[in-house]
C-alpha cells in the first residue's frame, strides 16, 4: 500500500538524495551529492563510457556513494569506515546510477518476488507487476535526459549488460537433482 503511494521504503537512500526531515518516506535532494549524480549524467550524455566516467570521477576525487556516506557519519564501525575510505569509482557503480529511474523522479517498487515462500531466493518481478510512480520526488535529471542516457548506454554496452533479458525459469529447478 505504501509503495503504491510512492513512499520510499528502502534502507539506504539512493546517492544524491536525503530523507525529508518532516517525512522519512519522502526523498529530497542532497545539495552536494546530487551535483555529482548530475555530473555523471552530463558526462554520459557527452558520449563517455561508464569506465571513462569512473576514471574522471576518481581523477577529480569525487567521493563514491559509500565514501560519501562515511564522510556524512553514516558509518556503523571503524573497520567499515576504513574499508569505505579506500573505495573508488568503478564502471559498475556509474552504470547502476545511470540505470536508476529514481534520478528522473520515478519511484519503482516491488521489483523482486519470492516465487517459493520461505525460500531465500528472489527473482526480478515482471515489469507489469512492478509499482511505478512518476514524479514521486524531486528529480536530478529530466526524463528526456534519462532516456537519452539509456540510449547511450545501450549503444556502448549492448542489451545484455543493460538488463533487457529475462532468465528462463525452469519449473523443477531446485526440486530435482541428478
Residue spans for each PLM region:
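Conserved catalytic breakage-reunion loop centered on the nucleophilic residue
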Residues: 1-177
Amino acid at each position: 500500500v505504501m509503495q503504491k503511494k510512492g513512499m520510499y521504503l528502502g534502507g539506504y537512500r539512493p546517492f544524491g538524495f536525503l530523507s525529508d526531515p518532516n517525512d522519512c518516506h519522502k526523498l529530497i535532494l542532497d545539495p552536494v551529492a546530487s551535483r555529482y549524480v548530475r555530473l555523471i549524467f552530463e558526462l554520459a550524455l557527452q558520449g563517455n563510457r561508464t569506465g571513462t566516467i569512473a576514471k574522471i570521477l576518481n581523477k577529480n576525487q569525487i567521493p563514491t556513494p559509500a565514501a560519501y556516506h562515511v564522510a556524512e557519519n553514516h558509518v556503523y564501525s571503524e573497520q567499515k569506515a576504513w574499508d569505505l575510505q579506500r573505495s573508488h569509482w568503478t564502471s559498475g557503480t556509474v552504470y547502476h546510477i545511470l540505470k536508476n529511474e529514481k534520478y528522473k523522479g520515478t519511484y519503482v517498487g516491488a521489483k523482486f518476488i519470492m516465487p517459493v515462500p520461505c525460500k531465500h531466493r528472489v527473482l526480478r518481478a515482471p515489469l507489469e507487476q512492478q509499482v511505478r510512480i512518476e514524479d514521486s520526488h524531486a528529480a536530478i535529471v529530466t526524463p528526456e535526459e534519462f532516456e537519452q542516457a539509456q540510449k547511450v548506454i545501450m549503444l556502448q554496452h549492448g542489451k545484455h549488460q543493460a538488463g533487457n533479458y529475462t532468465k528462463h525459469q525452469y519449473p523443477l529447478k531446485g526440486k530435482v537433482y541428478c
